[in-house]
Curated annotation (Swiss-Prot):
Main localization (coarse): host cell
The protein's name in its UniProt record: Uncharacterized protein R387
Residues spanning the membrane: 3-23
Organism listed in the record: Acanthamoeba polyphaga mimivirus
Record keywords: Coiled coil, Glycoprotein, Host membrane, Membrane, Signal-anchor, Transmembrane, Transmembrane helix, Virion
Glycosylation sites per record: N37, N125
UniProt KW Disulfide bond keyword: no
UniProt key word Coiled coil: yes
GO cellular component: host cell membrane; membrane; virion component
Compartment(s) where it occurs, according to its Swiss-Prot or TrEMBL record: Host membrane; Virion
Disulfide bond sites: none
Membrane topology, as annotated: Single-pass type II membrane protein
Length: 265
Protein backbone atom coordinates (compact mmCIF):
# COMPACT_ATOMS: atom_id res chain seq x y z
CA UNK A 1 0.00 0.00 0.00
CA UNK A 2 1.21 3.47 -0.82
CA UNK A 3 1.59 6.31 1.69
CA UNK A 4 -1.79 7.91 0.81
CA UNK A 5 -3.63 4.65 1.59
CA UNK A 6 -2.00 4.47 5.00
CA UNK A 7 -3.10 8.04 5.72
CA UNK A 8 -6.73 7.12 4.87
CA UNK A 9 -6.53 4.03 7.09
CA UNK A 10 -5.20 6.07 10.03
CA UNK A 11 -7.92 8.70 9.54
CA UNK A 12 -10.58 5.96 9.45
CA UNK A 13 -9.23 4.40 12.64
CA UNK A 14 -9.28 7.79 14.38
CA UNK A 15 -12.88 8.38 13.27
CA UNK A 16 -13.92 4.93 14.51
CA UNK A 17 -12.25 5.53 17.88
CA UNK A 18 -13.97 8.93 18.20
CA UNK A 19 -17.35 7.37 17.40
CA UNK A 20 -16.80 4.60 19.97
CA UNK A 21 -15.78 7.19 22.57
CA UNK A 22 -18.82 9.35 21.80
CA UNK A 23 -21.36 6.52 22.05
CA UNK A 24 -19.82 5.14 25.23
CA UNK A 25 -19.99 8.57 26.86
CA UNK A 26 -23.50 9.15 25.55
CA UNK A 27 -24.72 5.86 27.00
CA UNK A 28 -22.96 6.60 30.28
CA UNK A 29 -24.57 10.05 30.47
CA UNK A 30 -27.96 8.55 29.64
CA UNK A 31 -27.51 5.97 32.38
CA UNK A 32 -26.58 8.78 34.79
CA UNK A 33 -29.73 10.70 33.87
CA UNK A 34 -31.86 7.60 34.48
CA UNK A 35 -30.20 7.00 37.86
CA UNK A 36 -30.69 10.66 38.82
CA UNK A 37 -34.36 10.53 37.83
CA UNK A 38 -34.89 7.35 39.83
CA UNK A 39 -33.18 8.88 42.88
CA UNK A 40 -35.14 12.11 42.45
CA UNK A 41 -38.47 10.27 42.30
CA UNK A 42 -37.51 8.18 45.32
CA UNK A 43 -36.64 11.33 47.28
CA UNK A 44 -39.99 12.87 46.36
CA UNK A 45 -41.79 9.80 47.70
CA UNK A 46 -39.75 9.75 50.92
CA UNK A 47 -40.36 13.45 51.58
CA UNK A 48 -44.07 13.05 50.88
CA UNK A 49 -44.19 10.16 53.36
CA UNK A 50 -42.39 12.22 56.01
CA UNK A 51 -44.79 15.09 55.41
CA UNK A 52 -47.72 12.79 56.13
CA UNK A 53 -46.00 11.65 59.33
CA UNK A 54 -45.53 15.29 60.35
CA UNK A 55 -49.21 16.11 59.83
CA UNK A 56 -50.31 12.98 61.71
CA UNK A 57 -47.92 13.76 64.57
CA UNK A 58 -49.23 17.33 64.71
CA UNK A 59 -52.79 16.01 65.03
CA UNK A 60 -51.76 13.60 67.80
CA UNK A 61 -49.99 16.28 69.84
CA UNK A 62 -52.82 18.79 69.36
CA UNK A 63 -55.23 16.28 70.92
CA UNK A 64 -53.01 15.54 73.93
CA UNK A 65 -54.14 16.49 77.41
CA UNK A 66 -51.30 18.19 79.29
CA UNK A 67 -49.46 16.78 81.10
CA UNK A 68 -49.28 13.78 78.79
CA UNK A 69 -48.41 10.33 80.19
CA UNK A 70 -44.68 9.61 80.21
CA UNK A 71 -45.12 6.59 77.93
CA UNK A 72 -46.91 8.77 75.35
CA UNK A 73 -44.24 11.48 75.52
CA UNK A 74 -41.45 8.91 75.11
CA UNK A 75 -43.22 7.36 72.13
CA UNK A 76 -43.62 10.76 70.46
CA UNK A 77 -39.97 11.60 71.12
CA UNK A 78 -38.91 8.34 69.50
CA UNK A 79 -41.07 9.15 66.47
CA UNK A 80 -39.41 12.56 66.19
CA UNK A 81 -35.96 10.96 66.47
CA UNK A 82 -36.84 8.50 63.69
CA UNK A 83 -38.04 11.34 61.46
CA UNK A 84 -34.88 13.34 62.15
CA UNK A 85 -32.72 10.36 61.19
CA UNK A 86 -34.56 10.17 57.86
CA UNK A 87 -34.22 13.93 57.37
CA UNK A 88 -30.46 13.64 57.93
CA UNK A 89 -30.16 10.80 55.42
CA UNK A 90 -32.19 12.64 52.79
CA UNK A 91 -30.18 15.84 53.34
CA UNK A 92 -27.02 13.90 52.48
CA UNK A 93 -28.66 12.50 49.35
CA UNK A 94 -29.82 15.96 48.30
CA UNK A 95 -26.31 17.36 48.70
CA UNK A 96 -24.97 14.70 46.34
CA UNK A 97 -27.81 14.79 43.83
CA UNK A 98 -28.75 18.47 43.60
CA UNK A 99 -25.76 19.63 41.46
CA UNK A 100 -26.71 17.11 38.75
CA UNK A 101 -30.41 17.99 38.56
CA UNK A 102 -31.77 20.34 35.91
CA UNK A 103 -32.92 23.71 37.21
CA UNK A 104 -36.63 22.89 37.01
CA UNK A 105 -36.14 19.81 39.22
CA UNK A 106 -34.00 21.81 41.65
CA UNK A 107 -36.79 24.37 41.98
CA UNK A 108 -39.44 21.68 42.33
CA UNK A 109 -37.43 19.87 44.99
CA UNK A 110 -36.81 23.11 46.90
CA UNK A 111 -40.56 23.81 46.87
CA UNK A 112 -41.37 20.35 48.27
CA UNK A 113 -38.73 20.74 50.98
CA UNK A 114 -40.03 24.18 51.93
CA UNK A 115 -43.54 22.78 52.42
CA UNK A 116 -42.12 20.14 54.76
CA UNK A 117 -40.11 22.79 56.63
CA UNK A 118 -43.19 24.96 57.17
CA UNK A 119 -45.13 21.98 58.52
CA UNK A 120 -42.17 21.06 60.74
CA UNK A 121 -42.02 24.63 62.07
CA UNK A 122 -45.75 24.55 62.89
CA UNK A 123 -45.34 21.22 64.65
CA UNK A 124 -42.30 22.40 66.62
CA UNK A 125 -44.18 25.48 67.82
CA UNK A 126 -47.02 23.41 69.30
CA UNK A 127 -45.04 20.38 70.48
CA UNK A 128 -41.94 21.86 72.08
CA UNK A 129 -43.42 22.40 75.54
CA UNK A 130 -45.01 18.93 75.42
CA UNK A 131 -42.16 16.66 74.27
CA UNK A 132 -39.19 19.07 74.32
CA UNK A 133 -37.91 17.70 71.02
CA UNK A 134 -37.65 19.45 67.63
CA UNK A 135 -38.12 18.16 64.10
CA UNK A 136 -35.06 18.99 62.01
CA UNK A 137 -35.35 20.99 58.79
CA UNK A 138 -34.35 20.08 55.26
CA UNK A 139 -31.66 21.92 53.37
CA UNK A 140 -33.56 23.17 50.34
CA UNK A 141 -30.39 23.94 48.43
CA UNK A 142 -29.45 27.08 46.56
CA UNK A 143 -33.00 27.60 45.26
CA UNK A 144 -34.72 27.31 48.62
CA UNK A 145 -34.44 28.28 52.26
CA UNK A 146 -33.43 25.93 55.03
CA UNK A 147 -36.08 27.22 57.41
CA UNK A 148 -39.38 29.02 56.79
CA UNK A 149 -38.98 32.76 56.76
CA UNK A 150 -40.94 35.18 58.95
CA UNK A 151 -42.24 38.53 57.73
CA UNK A 152 -40.24 40.26 60.49
CA UNK A 153 -36.91 38.80 59.41
CA UNK A 154 -34.23 41.49 59.55
CA UNK A 155 -32.14 41.70 56.39
CA UNK A 156 -28.63 43.13 56.27
CA UNK A 157 -26.35 42.85 53.24
CA UNK A 158 -23.30 43.27 55.47
CA UNK A 159 -24.16 40.32 57.70
CA UNK A 160 -24.46 36.72 56.58
CA UNK A 161 -28.11 36.00 55.82
CA UNK A 162 -28.02 32.68 57.61
CA UNK A 163 -26.98 34.35 60.90
CA UNK A 164 -29.98 36.66 60.82
CA UNK A 165 -32.32 33.90 59.72
CA UNK A 166 -31.11 31.61 62.48
CA UNK A 167 -31.59 34.37 65.06
CA UNK A 168 -35.08 35.14 63.77
CA UNK A 169 -35.90 31.43 63.83
CA UNK A 170 -34.83 31.20 67.46
CA UNK A 171 -37.07 34.16 68.34
CA UNK A 172 -39.98 32.62 66.43
CA UNK A 173 -39.49 29.32 68.24
CA UNK A 174 -39.49 31.05 71.62
CA UNK A 175 -42.66 32.93 70.69
CA UNK A 176 -44.25 29.63 69.73
CA UNK A 177 -43.35 28.02 73.07
CA UNK A 178 -44.61 31.02 75.05
CA UNK A 179 -47.86 31.10 73.10
CA UNK A 180 -48.40 27.38 73.61
CA UNK A 181 -47.87 27.57 77.38
CA UNK A 182 -50.20 30.57 77.71
CA UNK A 183 -52.90 28.69 75.81
CA UNK A 184 -52.65 25.84 78.32
CA UNK A 185 -52.69 28.26 81.26
CA UNK A 186 -55.83 29.90 79.91
CA UNK A 187 -57.63 26.56 80.23
CA UNK A 188 -56.89 26.38 83.96
CA UNK A 189 -58.53 29.65 84.93
CA UNK A 190 -57.31 31.15 88.20
CA UNK A 191 -55.27 28.21 89.47
CA UNK A 192 -52.51 26.04 88.03
CA UNK A 193 -53.00 22.35 88.87
CA UNK A 194 -50.14 20.41 90.40
CA UNK A 195 -50.22 18.03 87.44
CA UNK A 196 -49.11 20.85 85.11
CA UNK A 197 -46.28 22.18 87.27
CA UNK A 198 -43.75 19.57 86.15
CA UNK A 199 -44.41 20.35 82.48
CA UNK A 200 -44.22 24.09 83.21
CA UNK A 201 -40.89 23.53 84.96
CA UNK A 202 -39.51 21.74 81.89
CA UNK A 203 -40.81 24.48 79.60
CA UNK A 204 -39.19 27.20 81.74
CA UNK A 205 -35.87 25.34 81.68
CA UNK A 206 -36.13 24.93 77.90
CA UNK A 207 -36.87 28.64 77.43
CA UNK A 208 -33.90 29.65 79.57
CA UNK A 209 -31.54 27.39 77.60
CA UNK A 210 -32.67 28.98 74.33
CA UNK A 211 -32.53 32.52 75.76
CA UNK A 212 -28.98 31.92 77.04
CA UNK A 213 -28.00 30.75 73.56
CA UNK A 214 -29.40 33.94 72.00
CA UNK A 215 -27.71 36.16 74.60
CA UNK A 216 -24.37 34.45 73.98
CA UNK A 217 -24.37 35.09 70.21
CA UNK A 218 -26.26 38.38 70.04
CA UNK A 219 -23.49 40.93 70.86
CA UNK A 220 -21.27 39.84 67.97
CA UNK A 221 -24.17 40.10 65.53
CA UNK A 222 -25.50 43.45 66.78
CA UNK A 223 -22.11 45.10 66.24
CA UNK A 224 -22.48 44.54 62.49
CA UNK A 225 -25.97 46.02 62.15
CA UNK A 226 -26.65 49.56 61.03
CA UNK A 227 -28.79 51.77 63.36
CA UNK A 228 -32.05 51.12 61.51
CA UNK A 229 -31.55 47.37 61.51
CA UNK A 230 -30.58 47.43 65.16
CA UNK A 231 -33.78 49.32 66.02
CA UNK A 232 -35.87 46.77 64.14
CA UNK A 233 -34.14 43.89 65.87
CA UNK A 234 -34.51 45.54 69.28
CA UNK A 235 -38.22 46.02 68.64
CA UNK A 236 -38.64 42.31 67.91
CA UNK A 237 -36.64 41.33 70.99
CA UNK A 238 -38.60 43.81 73.15
CA UNK A 239 -41.85 42.18 72.04
CA UNK A 240 -40.39 38.80 72.96
CA UNK A 241 -39.32 40.07 76.38
CA UNK A 242 -42.80 41.47 77.01
CA UNK A 243 -44.30 38.06 76.23
CA UNK A 244 -41.74 36.36 78.48
CA UNK A 245 -42.50 38.79 81.29
CA UNK A 246 -46.23 38.21 80.91
CA UNK A 247 -45.69 34.44 81.00
CA UNK A 248 -43.49 34.81 84.07
CA UNK A 249 -46.28 36.69 85.86
CA UNK A 250 -48.86 34.10 84.80
CA UNK A 251 -46.78 31.22 86.13
CA UNK A 252 -45.99 33.04 89.36
CA UNK A 253 -44.67 30.63 91.95
CA UNK A 254 -45.79 27.57 89.98
CA UNK A 255 -42.24 27.04 88.74
CA UNK A 256 -38.94 27.26 90.59
CA UNK A 257 -37.00 28.29 87.47
CA UNK A 258 -37.20 32.02 86.90
CA UNK A 259 -37.63 32.72 83.18
CA UNK A 260 -34.84 34.93 81.85
CA UNK A 261 -35.00 37.77 79.32
CA UNK A 262 -33.10 38.47 76.12
CA UNK A 263 -30.40 41.11 76.56
CA UNK A 264 -31.10 44.04 74.25
CA UNK A 265 -28.01 45.93 73.06
Amino acid sequence: MDKKTWVYIIIAIIIILLLVWYFRNHMSDQKGVNVNNQTYNMLQQQISSLNQQILFLKQQISNLHVPAPTSTVNSLRQTVSDINQQVSTINNQISSLNPYLPRNQQLELASVLSIFNRNALDLNNISRSVINRDINYFNAGQHGSQVPQNSHTVQNPNVADNELNVLQQKVDNLNGVVSNIRQHLAQFGSGIPESFRDEAEKAASYLNDRIDDINKNLPNLVQRLNPNQRNNLNRILSELNNDLSSLKNSLGSAVRNRINSVNIH
